[in-house]
Amino acid sequence: MNRRQKWAFGLWLIAVSVSAQTDVWRSDSLQEVVVTGTGTQHLLKNAPVQTEVITAKMLRNYGGRSLQDILAGLTASFAFNEDDMGAQMQLNGLGNDYILILVDGKRIHGDVGGQNDLNLIDPHNIEKIEIVKGASSALYGSDAIAGVINVITKKHNEGLLAENSTRVGSYGDIRQHNGVGFAIGKLRSYTNFQLQHSDGWQNTATEDPRQTEFLIEDSRNMTVNRHTNWQVSERLTYEPLKGLEFYAEGSTYWKRIYRPTGKYRGVDIKTYDMMYRNQSLAAGGKWQFNKTDQVTLDVNWDRHAYYYYYTAITLGDGYDPHGNFTPYYPFFPDDEDLQSDQRRTMAHLKGIFTLPYSNRLSAGLEWRRDYLEAPMRVRDGEASDHTEAAYVQDEFRHAFSPKTILDITPGLRLNHNGQFGFRLTPKVSAMLSLGSDIRLRATWSQGFKTPTPKELYYRYVRNMNGTYLYLGNEDLRPQTSNYYALSGEYNWQGLNVTVTGYLNRVDNMITLVTIPNNQAPGEYIITYDPIKTRQYQNLESAKTKGIDVSLRWRLDREWMVGGSYSYLDTEAKQYDTTHECLVDVVIDGTARHKGSWFATWNHDFSKAWHAGFGLYGRMSSTRHYQINGDGKGYQIWRFSTNHEFPVSKKWLFRLEAGIDNIFDYVDTTPHGLHLGTTTPGRTVYATLTVRFAHGKNLKFTNNKKSNFKTNENETD
């Protein structure tokens, strides 16, 4: 163990060995209300579907700069490796394509290279995050094979609200949040603006010599490129009658990734930046009959458009004035060229009804249409798909005794796809409560995911130390999955321990596979002369299995320690047509061991000064890939502090600061090879928040509760 590791371990021991007060305070984060697993409200401790929650208090203590930062730092099940294509997110070994990301129960939309843009979600406006692993819920679609992340946003009920939060950090990192809300009679409005910017950074100027003609040690390629994005959103709600509410909301988003150019052709010469324009519109309503029964209707439209923004004269794919395709079409500085325009329209009708004999029924209908326009990347320039679904779920409770209670939640979802037909996917979850301290849970669920238009029809070229050709595959088959999980939860005097074992078997898994160039269409090889060709193909079978362990221990009212560990084992096989046999294939980006840990201390120095301090760590073993090397293992530590100053009943000031990557770890693997982490090394940040709120529903900070809290059940 080297000196840095000893120092880190010593800090951890100091944090966890602080003596508890004699009056041990039982953590009541288990009183958190969750909705994601079943679509109905449950206390976390009584949720029949295993749900992990990142609470508002955890978010405040951690001070994350983005959703990616939050998930990576506070739960071991996630892995990220940010690049121009997105966050490269994984959950228990399965990538972004298998993870459903929701904001208040509604899907976010749009991706590049299969990666969602997590910058669409303003971290300052997050109330809490609920995570359900596996295709455990019939409510959100069986294509969520890896799991569901539901980001619950803050709900503002003040008569007048104005807030500003500004964060600055190393490498030109700027995060700006502005919110304005008001209520006039039965009408409420909230307008949100967010701005994010980073100058980017370069961990190394060396290129992988195996991918270049000679050694290059002065490359201009960045580890993370300079980028800027902003978003404006508006939400209106109207409540004409008690229990009846209508809403309308919309947003617009813009992002540009700036790519510096160098002097080595095919390596670091860049002639265009990447630009995105997103828009979304949604409307709907909720009719609450009584405390338990309700009907909701949601209709939404989303657009995600991706462009090249040219910075130099470039010859590329295009159509001449006569409509003929040419790979030598001239583009000039400031020209914009559409690469893909993804549009999605959805309608969702759902009802929740209480039935006799301790049953609660949820049922719904869903319609979805996907449209893709990509003039240079899809044959005929466009493709579309449509899916319909009907689902039903029952929640049943039986008490064998006052302390022994069984909850069973079965569900069925009937899926229909315009190209691949019908598929019925069943699910069942059960929880056995043994007293107030022990919970045993089990889940079995099936998933069904059809190929996307991009996986079927896409064709694109990526220049990265040479030309890489990526191809769709019209012969793809739908993916199916069987997910099994067993978990045990134990609670005792502030200690919460959860152990979960799982197996996720995916048949016909779709992934990018390197194929011989002679298997690609000849016209593409002649036009682009790629050094490697990758195509979407079905694997014969793939398995991810592992164990997740989570521990939280509330030592007293001020001290809390905890951590999580994830063990992952994967197995994937593909049929080799050349040798007519099954061969092992690596699931890209998987790491066998991941962990995270924390120790926090919160203290009220006075009624006008609440302070919090946190020490955090995370680690990962080697991440494995099919090509271009494996990512190195790493261990990163972080310190953060936050201070709230409620100077009056209307005004609140909040100051945050921290150091990330305390021991300055940097992965200097040459460009062209995979990194374990893209961190630039030690960074610092500071955030100032100013909030003015006025109205009869305004909640103020007292000795133990934050003025930022909007969920009355969250006290963690």
Identify what each model region corresponds to.
Residues Q68-K106:
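Extracytoplasmic beta-strand/coil segments of soluble accessory domains associated
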Residues S29-L59, Q88, I99:
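N-terminal periplasmic "start-of-domain" segments of outer-membrane beta-barrel proteins
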